[in-house]
């Protein structure tokens, strides 16, 4: 069978601004849960209305007037969701305040924090959006076994059986499989399901590993100091692990290789991310449809793209400084250069930095 290499899925892990419209399309396994029109990005584009899409992997917002202004926020980056009173530019002149959704996020492996504020035009839309975001966020947090490699976990029962996940089916159980991660190797059991491969030691079920197909870069057989072995390599975002397993005889090893490669390929075509959402009767989950993916973006490219390539730094617009979810923001102070009271500028930044315009070349 032809070997198929997996790819890093960034959609649920990263925060990106103003991406190409192709990157806003739903990927395999991504499901649109809700679509709310007339949602204002109050912090970064105050006064500009747009569309918010909630999927099982991320939040997607784009401006209605210029779809190239957009945000994609992966659930793995979101650290908190709150509902607060705020005043948007649209309603400020009428003296009206709205409930807004505050999304707190953090870039993985860094201390950089972001704060996003989204405001809807009516209470019904706000409630629907807030409830959906909160529910999907909780669902994502509680289903990491579908998407992350786990070692020495508690997914094996005392009797040596695997704790099955929802939507998971055991395909094959193989005894007498050696894990080659130690000098002498450890004898154990290999369990193959439609979602992952699991190995655990016969003498110690706490010594185990669970490898979802979504984390796999490649599956192959190659030479090791123990002889020919089944080698699982994980993607960069999954730690780039190289896991070796040996099973005899060679024919049995080849059959194991074909089974895992086949399931890996099938899972890449239709991944199971584990994030589910029970909608109300009046609502309807919208799965991926090619015809629907394009409607959020104008695909007609203009000859002149100056307006599309110039935008104030999106990073600075949403940068949350050193505030935590419970911190109170500092009161405004007088800035002599402007003659106005402004929020204190964070250490390391200047007034000039805040006015600087970044041009993509």
Swiss-Prot record:
GO terms for cellular component: axoneme; BBSome; centriolar satellite; ciliary basal body; ciliary base; ciliary membrane; cilium; non-motile cilium. Keywords: Cell membrane, Cell projection, Cilium, Cilium biogenesis/degradation, Cytoplasm, Cytoskeleton, Membrane, Protein transport, Transport. It is found in: Cell projection, Cilium membrane; Cytoplasm; Cytoplasm, Cytoskeleton, Cilium basal body; Cytoplasm, Cytoskeleton, Microtubule organizing center, Centrosome, Centriolar satellite. It holds the Pfam family BBL5. It comes from the Eukaryota. SMART domains: DM16. The keyword Protein transport applies. Disulfide bonds: none annotated. Disruption phenotype: Single mutants do not display any obvious defects in ciliogenesis. Double bbs-5 and bbs-4 mutants display a defect in cilia structure and function. This is characterized by increased accumulation and mislocalization of intraflagellar transport proteins and impaired movement of intraflagellar transport proteins along the ciliary axoneme. Double mutants also have defective polycystin-mediated cilia signaling and mislocalized and increased accumulation of mechanosensory receptors pkd-2, osm-9 and odr-10 within cilia. GO terms for molecular function: phosphatidylinositol-3-phosphate binding. GO terms for biological process: cilium assembly; intracellular transport; protein transport. Part of BBSome complex, that contains at least bbs-1, bbs-2, bbs-4, bbs-5, osm-12, bbs-8/ttc-8 and bbs-9. Interacts with bbs-4 (via C-terminus); the interaction is direct. Belongs to the BBS5 family. Component of the BBSome complex. The BBSome complex is thought to function as a coat complex required for sorting of specific membrane proteins to the primary cilia. The BBSome complex is required for ciliogenesis but is dispensable for centriolar satellite function. Required for BBSome complex ciliary localization but not for the proper complex assembly. Required, redundantly with bbs-4, for cilia biogenesis and both the assembly and movement of intraflagellar transport proteins along the ciliary axoneme. Plays a role in the removal of degraded mechanosensory receptors within the cilia. This is BBSome complex member bbs-5. It comes from Caenorhabditis elegans.
């Amino acid at each position: 069978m032809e070997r198929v290499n997996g790819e890093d899925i960034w959609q649920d892990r990263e925060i990106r601004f103003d991406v190409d419209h192709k990157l806003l399309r739903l990927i395999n396994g991504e499901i649109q849960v809700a679509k709310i029109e007339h949602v204002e990005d109050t912090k970064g584009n105050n006064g500009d209305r747009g569309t918010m899409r909630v999927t099982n992997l991320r939040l997607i917002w784009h401006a209605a007037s210029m779809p190239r202004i957009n945000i994609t926020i992966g659930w793995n980056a979101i650290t908190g969701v709150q509902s607060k009173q705020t005043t948007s530019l649209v309603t400020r002149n009428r003296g009206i305040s709205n409930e807004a959704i505050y999304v707190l996020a953090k870039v993985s492996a860094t201390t950089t924090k972001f704060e996003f504020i989204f405001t809807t035009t009516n209470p019904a839309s706000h409630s629907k959006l807030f409830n959906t975001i909160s529910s999907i966020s909780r669902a994502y947090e509680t289903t990491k076994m579908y998407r992350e490699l786990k070692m020495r976990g508690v997914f094996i029962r005392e009797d040596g059986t695997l704790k099955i996940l929802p939507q998971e089916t055991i395909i094959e159980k193989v005894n007498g499989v050696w894990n080659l991660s130690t000098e002498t190797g450890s004898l154990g059991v290999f369990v193959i399901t439609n979602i992952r491969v699991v190995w655990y030691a016969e003498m110690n079920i706490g010594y185990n590993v669970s490898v979802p197909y979504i984390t796999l870069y490649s599956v192959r057989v190659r030479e090791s100091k123990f002889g020919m072995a089944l080698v699982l390599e994980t993607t960069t975002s999954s730690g780039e692990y190289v896991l070796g397993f040996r099973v005899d005889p060679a024919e049995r090893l080849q059959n194991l290789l074909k089974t895992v490669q086949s399931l890996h390929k099938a899972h890449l075509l239709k991944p199971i991310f584990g994030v589910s959402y029970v909608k109300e009767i009046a609502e309807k989950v919208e799965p991926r449809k090619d015809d629907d993916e394009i409607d959020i973006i104008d695909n007609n490219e203009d000859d002149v793209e100056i307006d599309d390539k110039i935008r104030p730094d999106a990073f600075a617009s949403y940068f949350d400084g050193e505030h935590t979810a419970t911190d109170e923001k500092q009161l405004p102070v007088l800035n002599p250069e402007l003659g106005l009271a402004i929020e204190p500028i964070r250490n390391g930044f200047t007034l000039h930095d805040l006015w600087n315009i970044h041009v993509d070349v």
